[in-house]
Design a protein with these regions (language model features):
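Catalytic-core region of right-hand nucleic acid polymerases
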Residues: 1-84, 133, 176-187
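A generic hydrophobic-helix recognition signal that picks specific residues
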Residues: 33, 68, 103-104, 149
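C-terminal reverse transcriptase regions that engage the nucleic-acid substrate
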Residues: 68, 148-187
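Active-site palm subdomain of RNA-directed nucleic acid polymerases
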Residues: 80-134, 143
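Helical (often loop-to-helix) elements that flank the catalytic cores of nucleotide-handling enzymes
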Residues: 119-138, 163-175
Length: 187
């Protein structure tokens, strides 16, 4: 039992992004601004190759043929835990590229959201460095879904940074099919 380690990966919430933005906004000086970068990792679970001895546990039989995975599958028992460790490591290494006074990074599974502070030029440079760092780590990036600016959508929320406030709303498509009957929520 001494070799066993119990852990729990704590995923970020919308408030963590808001808190990061507010902290950065407090530090803005003349010419500084705060922006958000949301850029998903593509096919993230398939980043982790299986040890050859483990491949025999990742086999499916379909239509008379056997299929063996060479990479961790998203729906596998330990896939989320293994991927969570890789995602958390990537987040820590990425955050270490800049001081907390310039970058506040949250990663929800395979969806990073970075709050950035600096001049527009500095923010562009920080974005380039983050993107190149992630690519150097082997991450595929969903550029077609990428967003940079004062308004982004991330994991079901819309964030808007204004001069006076940080506005968060639940995306409309998330709320479809949910209504309030006065006593509670119904689906």
């Amino acid at each position: 039992d001494a070799a066993r380690r119990y852990e729990r990966i704590v995923s970020p919430r919308a408030w963590d992004v808001v808190s990061g933005i507010m902290d950065l906004k407090k530090r803005t000086g003349k010419g500084d601004t705060a922006e958000l970068l949301a850029l998903d990792f593509a096919d993230a679970f398939y980043m982790l190759p299986l040890v050859p001895d483990e491949m025999r546990y990742y086999v499916a039989h379909y239509d008379g043929a056997f299929y063996m995975w060479e990479r961790i599958a998203q729906g596998s028992l330990n896939g989320p835990g293994a991927f969570g460790r890789l995602s958390a490591l990537t987040a820590r290494m990425s955050q270490a590229l800049y001081p907390p006074s310039s970058l506040s990074l949250q990663v929800y599974t395979d969806d990073p959201c970075a709050a950035l502070r600096g001049t527009p030029r500095q923010i562009k440079m920080m974005t380039v460095v983050l993107v190149l760092f992630w690519r150097a780590q082997g991450w595929g990036l969903s550029f077609h879904k990428g967003q940079l600016g004062r308004m982004v959508s991330w994991i079901g929320y819309s964030f808007t940074i204004s001069a006076e406030a940080v506005i968060v709303s639940i995306k409309e498509d998330v709320m479809k099919g949910v209504r309030c009957d006065g006593a509670g929520l119904e689906g």
